[in-house]
């Protein structure tokens, strides 16, 4: 018979008492009162933060936006078809975060940075909050480095420095996206990480952009964030913030980044839809009262950081679509007041054959020539003046039939300057070629060449400089100035080209 020892039993009980770990899990749970149109009303979530992620029974995630006395207004990040009235909702005590890091480069992701390109998961452990504070005044440095777009009209007259926010504004089908894509293509080999955010666009349009970037080898340094037209309004609202978070990761590592938001008009419309469904009071054009803050907190995240923070930068190129050229509408005026300047694309110029259709008269960069190399400053000042005088004379000449010789010559030169600013799509020019092209125009070397022949002459000149006089490009790239030696090389190239060109006509 087995003997029972009381001391042994008591020691076993003592061990089990010591190992006992009482853990009470308290979860904040609510009940769905109403659901529909991408919005859910939830009762019982007493301890929930604004912007907190909530999980529904079917696995759908939502964001708490409206905190009211008796319910919480939640926007859904999915279709929410399986959410029923009376089903439970759990607070996660988390704010929306997205994966970031080098592994994201070259990928196409959705508004929550989940891959949608069929290339598998993104192998990264780093995350950033979708909404984070913009750098303060002490954290910033004055912008001074040029971000070359490869578009002559912009780099010469509306220069963009690294860390600036420059608005691209114009009617639909005026080439806004083309300007942005050219800018991405021109960053090849410059060490700039590009983020292209497509908001509310057709999937076919996004696929076309991906195809162009892949073909030109630009996808190797670009991330594409896509919230397509068929995605919920919540994802279209979040996509720009996700793009900014991805770019911020590289900025705080001391790298240079470029973010393109295409376009913020659609984000504002998605936010208006959400706000009206949440029964927030409508304001001008039915937008909610905080629509200015929607864009200001996004665009303020673009900055040139101080040396203490690594001197990284985030340059933002937001795009806004206008209706019939009306820049005085609510969203355009808001974004114009937030940004550091705007590039205005005109439908009239586009239809007249001037592409890119940049209206230099009302386009502006508030930083100006601080973002230009010395060589560009040497030639760009005269170009602005010549074009301004040309526009004035052209308007005047419509009312006068007999013009003096000097006026006729100035009008002829203006026509040729306009012609040399034309560029093919997806063919950005390096800065040394831009300097050569502008120098040729402003110094009258094109005056005896027919306007329709200017494009062919410029093409021959660029080829001559790159093949026979490569030293010209080397001097501009290294010295950043149009030295006497570079100017002589350029004059020789122009002379050779003119001789060959005029003999063939």
From Swiss-Prot:
Transmembrane segments: none annotated. Coiled coil: none annotated. InterPro entries: ATP_synth_asu-like_sf, ATP_synth_asu_C, ATP_synth_asu_C_sf, ATP_synth_F1_a_nt-bd_dom, ATP_synth_F1_asu, ATPase_a/bsu_AS, ATPase_F1/V1/A1_a/bsu_N, ATPase_F1/V1/A1_a/bsu_N_sf. ATP binds at residues 170-177. The keyword Oxidoreductase does not apply. It is a peripheral membrane protein. Its main location: plastid. The record marks 363 as: Required for activity. It catalyses: ATP + H2O + 4 H(+)(in) = ADP + phosphate + 5 H(+)(out). It is found in: Plastid, Cyanelle thylakoid membrane. One of its GO terms (molecular function) is ADP binding. Keywords: ATP synthesis, ATP-binding, CF(1), Cyanelle, Hydrogen ion transport, Ion transport, Membrane, Nucleotide-binding, Plastid, Thylakoid, Translocase, Transport. One of its GO terms (cellular component) is proton-transporting ATP synthase complex. Its EC number is 7.1.2.2. The keyword ATP-binding applies. Belongs to the ATPase alpha/beta chains family. F-type ATPases have 2 components, CF(1) - the catalytic core - and CF(0) - the membrane proton channel. CF(1) has five subunits: alpha(3), beta(3), gamma(1), delta(1), epsilon(1). CF(0) has four main subunits: a, b, b' and c. Produces ATP from ADP in the presence of a proton gradient across the membrane. The alpha chain is a regulatory subunit. This is ATP synthase subunit alpha, cyanelle. It comes from Cyanophora paradoxa. The gene is atpA.
């Amino acid at each position: 018979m087995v003997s029972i020892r009381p001391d042994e039993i008591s020691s076993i009980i003592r061990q089990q008492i010591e190992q006992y770990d009482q853990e009470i899990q308290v979860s904040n749970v609510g009940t769905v009162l109403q659901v529909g149109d991408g919005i859910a009303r939830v009762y019982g979530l007493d301890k929930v933060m604004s912007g907190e992620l909530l999980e529904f029974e079917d696995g759908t995630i939502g964001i708490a936006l409206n905190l009211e006395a008796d319910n919480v207004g939640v926007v859904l990040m999915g279709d929410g078809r399986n959410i029923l009235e009376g089903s439970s909702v759990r607070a996660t005590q988390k704010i929306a975060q997205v994966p970031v890091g080098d592994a994201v480069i070259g990928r196409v992701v959705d508004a929550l940075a989940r891959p949608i390109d069929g290339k598998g998961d993104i192998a990264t452990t780093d995350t950033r909050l979708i909404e984070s504070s913009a750098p303060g005044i002490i954290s910033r440095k004055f912008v001074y480095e040029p971000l070359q777009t490869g578009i002559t009209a912009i780099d010469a007259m509306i220069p963009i420095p690294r860390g600036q926010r420059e608005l691209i504004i114009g009617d639909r089908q005026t080439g806004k996206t083309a300007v942005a894509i050219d800018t991405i293509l021109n960053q090849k080999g410059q060490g700039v990480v590009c983020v292209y955010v497509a908001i509310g666009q057709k999937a076919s349009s996004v696929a076309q952009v991906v195809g162009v970037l892949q073909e030109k080898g630009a996808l190797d340094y670009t991330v594409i964030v896509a919230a397509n037209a068929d995605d919920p309004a919540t994802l279209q609202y979040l996509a720009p913030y996700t793009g900014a978070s991805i770019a911020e990761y590289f900025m705080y590592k001391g790298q240079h980044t470029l973010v393109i938001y295409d376009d913020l008009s659609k984000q504002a419309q998605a936010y208006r839809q959400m706000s009206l469904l949440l029964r927030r009071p409508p304001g001008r054009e039915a937008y909610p009262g905080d629509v200015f803050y929607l864009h200001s907190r996004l665009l303020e995240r673009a900055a040139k950081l101080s040396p203490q923070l690594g001197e990284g930068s985030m340059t933002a190129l937001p795009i806004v679509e206008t209706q019939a050229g009306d820049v005085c509408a609510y969203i355009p005026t808001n974004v114009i007041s937030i940004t550091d300047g705007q590039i205005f694309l005109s439908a009239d110029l586009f239809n007249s054959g001037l592409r890119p259709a940049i209206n230099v008269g009302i386009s502006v960069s508030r930083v100006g020539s601080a973002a230009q190399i010395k060589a560009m400053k040497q030639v760009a000042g005269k170009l602005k003046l010549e074009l301004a005088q040309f526009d004035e004379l052209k308007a005047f000449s419509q009312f006068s039939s007999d013009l003096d010789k000097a006026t006729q010559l100035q009008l002829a030169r203006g026509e040729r300057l306009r012609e040399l600013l034309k560029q093919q799509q997806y063919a950005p020019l390096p800065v040394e070629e831009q300097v050569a092209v502008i120098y040729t125009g402003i110094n009258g070397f094109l005056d005896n060449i027919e306007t329709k022949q200017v494009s062919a002459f410029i093409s021959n000149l660029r080829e001559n400089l790159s093949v026979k006089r490569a030293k010209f490009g080397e001097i501009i790239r290294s010295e950043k100035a149009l030295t006497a030696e570079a100017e002589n090389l350029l004059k020789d190239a122009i002379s050779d080209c003119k001789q060959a060109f005029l003999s063939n006509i």
